[in-house]
Amino acid sequence: YEDPIEIIKHLMIGSEGTLAFFSDITYYTVVDEKHKACTLMIYETIETACDVVPLLKKTPVSAVELLDRESIRSIEEDPEAPAYFRTLPETACLLLVEIQADDEETMAKKETAVRGGVASIPTIQPYKFTSDPKEYNFNWKARKGLLSTIGGLRPTGTTCLIEDVAFPIDKLGAAC
């Protein structure tokens, strides 16, 4: 690009003052399949939950999110929250796991594959995949609202830092 207007049209200003120029872009999108189900896999510790992530990577999951005990505590009084949230051990950690498929038969196969993939590491309690809109939506609402919820619980005068960090997946448990 040589025309200054075209150059300006291809600039992007990101967070923390990042400036980028796009000369070419290709989007790779994720298919939003018709059927969705999610579950909460609860583990004794964050390290154990992190050790499950490499196993889940080998299965047909569409999303995995980690919620530590502080995250769970921040939503346990929500009227839609499961009662067992309030009785979890202080070290508990959960994984919100989602699967998607175009048909029920494929969903069942994916659920079986996920269960088999993580069977070697026990959860605190049995888990079930749910497509029930109320349960499904609460699980994702809880995850998506964490930043504001936890940020609001911090002591006065403190700051909530949010930074992206990356670790090799097989070192995730040790990193936590």
Question: What name fits each language-model region?
Answer:
Residues 1-176:
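Noncatalytic alpha-helical scaffold of FAD-dependent oxidoreductases
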